[in-house]
Amino acid sequence: MNLQILFEEQTKLLNKINLEKKRYLYEKINWNLKSIGILGQRGLGKTTMMLQYIKENFSQTNNALYISLDNPYMQSLSLFEFAKEFEQLGGEVLFVDEVHKYENWSTHIKNIYDALTLRVVFSGSSILQISQQNSDLSRRSIIYTLENLSFREYLELCDIYKFDSFCLEDILKNHQSIATDITKHIKPLMHFKEYLQ
């Protein structure tokens, strides 16, 4: 296996990654856990979040590696053996994207968890396929779900305005003052039409 090629591909991806704008889930993930799953629909930013974490924490080292299992090269390898070799070469964290495209992926993740000290962060967009895997990851992995972009998050990511988030109870109690504050800063209906497109 030629890790150098994979690190070169990772460097190209990291060069395109912006660290200034992050999805809400980024700060909620405990990145120090041994096994983390990030689930969500396609195009929500799972890959970007993983690459942001690598860029922010490992950009000057080869201790973290991003791989995508929709890569034909990765399809031809044993994920467990790949992870084992990466760990032997000093790897600390393996980021595995598109896990649902790899047959028996959950067995490999389970074996990595049980046999190696390597941490693994995996993501996938086919929640149905992921939930149908038969290996018991529930005791080994913490699963986070990346939801669709909220209107509040859209406003922040587009640099329109950054509003605090509120729980439902606060909204029900203080809806008038919250609405008044919002309309002081933006015209919500104008931006909401853009958000829906």
Map each language-model feature to its residues.
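Hydrophobic anchor at the beta1->P-loop junction of P-loop NTPases
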Residues: 38
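Pre-Walker A adenine-sensing motif
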Residues: 13-31
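Short glycine-rich substrate-engagement loop in P-loop NTPases that contacts/grips substrate
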Residues: 61-93
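Walker A (P-loop) phosphate-binding loop of P-loop NTPases
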Residues: 42-43
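Conserved lysine of the Walker
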Residues: 46-47
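Conserved P-loop NTPase "ATPase switch" module shared by AAA+ and STAND
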Residues: 87-105
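Interdomain motor-coupling "hinge/lid" segment immediately C-terminal to the ATP-binding subdomain
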Residues: 2-13, 132-197
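Structural recognition of the conserved hydrophobic beta-strand(s) that form the central parallel beta-sheet
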Residues: 119-125
